[in-house]
Amino acid sequence: MVKGKILFGDVFSALRCLEDNSISVALTSPPYWRQRDYGFKGQIGREKTPEEYIGRLIVIFRELRAKLKDDGVFFLNIGDKYKNRYGKSHLLQIPYRLAAHMIKDGWKLLDIIIWYKPNHMPSSVKDRFTNTYEPVLVFGKSDENIYTKKHPVLKIPLQQTKWKHTAVFPEKLVSSLLSRCNLKDGDYILDPFAGTGTTGAVVKKMKYQLYPKDLNVILIEKGKKFLDIITERTGIKEIKELKSSEYTWEPVNDKLAFSEDKPLIIIEDTHGETFIAKNSEEFSRIIMGMLSEEFQDFHREDAVYFFGVKNWKLSDLVLPGLLIDHGFILRNMIIIEDGSSWYPVFMLVKDTTRVNYKFYIDRIRKKPKTVLPEKWNQEDFIGLIVNDNLSKKPRKGEVVDIISTYSQDNFPKIVAVSWEDDNISLELCLNPRKDEFIMESLQFTCPHCGTQLIDTYDPLGDNICYNCQKEIYGKNSLPILKESKEIIESLESVENGEYQVGENIKPQYQKRCKESKSKFAGMERMNWGASPGARKTIIGDSFSKMRLYRLDQPTIARYLNIYMKKNDLRIKDITQALPPEYKHTVGHWFRKDFGGSIPLPEDVTLLEEILKLDKEFARILKRSVLKLQTVKHSLKGKNPGDFLELEENKLKEYLTKTYMPPSYYIKK
């Protein structure tokens, strides 16, 4: 059992109960902004804006500072958050903005430790580096303190626990942080946001280590559901319930500020830039240069920028997060481990709704480690839930029969799905061994020379075939679409003149099929819920119905615009030819900016006659598929994440790969 107590109540009231200058180390991870709801009123992290969240924490940590000894240390682990903006989410830089305001409030910033998580969860994100680290801010009341600086990067895996708390930080992280302090027997350790009591559990174990420490711990927790867990982990029996105290706070106000130095305008590549500044002053000049007309006129609107700084200051970590009000979005703060230190590189893109930026993550992926079964047991799939989000009205269904399988591993290829709206359909399933490659297998070929095109339609520049140098995506030069032989053969085994895979079967047609020699023969109609319920496969728990191909929206919009012009139509004419509910939808199909959308399969059926669409083009737009939903890395490899161990001379080449146009990249 560890010596200490649990204060059950809000953090501000609990801190006020503590004696001033009594705590040697405070160590905590408060609720992140807008991350989750812990189920009680007045909880921290539910504020409307990040500015309110930061302002509130400043007030709380001001109270904490009064309780800290003069040589005490405060470890603050706090995660960042993205804020959506026109489809491009902006990294808010909450930890570093908070640190800057805490310094203004009287704290001393002693260190910023990077906690890298080697076993971070895989992510499907493709337009930036996935998040793999969190900062630990180290504060003190004075320069004379018990903190000992060590390597500022900790590589500690996430820790699995039996407790239902999604934000448990590992015991090893707590022990590593405490080991950096010169602690004495009898010292008090405080965790003002105790959660499941990890800090207390570590302090308890320190009593039995090789060089034992007999420490006291105070844990503050507002969530009642965590009290039993804390008691179990720490053995602390003393729980004091507190009444809430009212307190007020003001949102912070951050403004972009520059020195009087001359801007440094980087203009080398219209598609993007990579530059590592030597120091804070040079970095500030680069950011100033980004706001200049010369910089913005030179670069394409879909360019990507990587600007870093070696000998950085805290203000450099704050600055890029403030560019959201000046025309740029911060997508990543990438950490580069550099010997005994680290430095940041910021991924920035233009804040525009006209086009999406060009970022090719596939070029730098790491080799995947996902292991799939050699053979699949077909029984695992009967009764499996199917979620259809490709229809106008989302619906659920379940697999009722397996028509055919892939020969190499018995994974279902064609299945019958019974839907909750009393329809039934045959669906093509993607084999997890090659699902991503199939979804990106649609080829666009030059109508002049037949060369497979590399670049998608460019709404900002000239569209020229890189081989024959002739115009493409014009009125009479739309690229020809080609499907893979594997897909064509799989679908032709089922489809005939009357049916396309993925379509609902009408009751009368279904009855006719059962009496024929078709793939539906002998299949009995099943009532919703009557089949074996929602079995889970080895690595997945449902299928999702989605588009067979990953289509570039501006490219599809270009095709539709050409067809509209060929038929001498306007958007107004198309809207009038469709049912009234399409009034606010049609215009989005022809937009090539962030407001654009691709018609759903049922929409394409209506557009075929109006626009006289090429049958093959329409068929491709209507193609659908079932994909097994499971947590696995991309077959192309793992997103490398925002923590890199690269020498500076290799870093520029590495990052430049991510925005280099495909035709240039292949030549390299």
From Swiss-Prot:
It comes from the Archaea. GO terms for biological process: DNA restriction-modification system; methylation. It catalyses: a 2'-deoxycytidine in DNA + S-adenosyl-L-methionine = an N(4)-methyl-2'-deoxycytidine in DNA + S-adenosyl-L-homocysteine + H(+). One of its GO terms (molecular function) is DNA binding. Signal peptide: none annotated. The keyword Transferase applies. Keywords: DNA-binding, Methyltransferase, Restriction system, S-adenosyl-L-methionine, Transferase. Its EC number is 2.1.1.113. Belongs to the N(4)/N(6)-methyltransferase family. N(4) subfamily. This is Type II methyltransferase M.MwoI. It comes from Methanothermobacter wolfeii. The lineage of its organism: Archaea, Methanobacteriati, Methanobacteriota, Methanomada group, Methanobacteria. The gene is mwoIM.
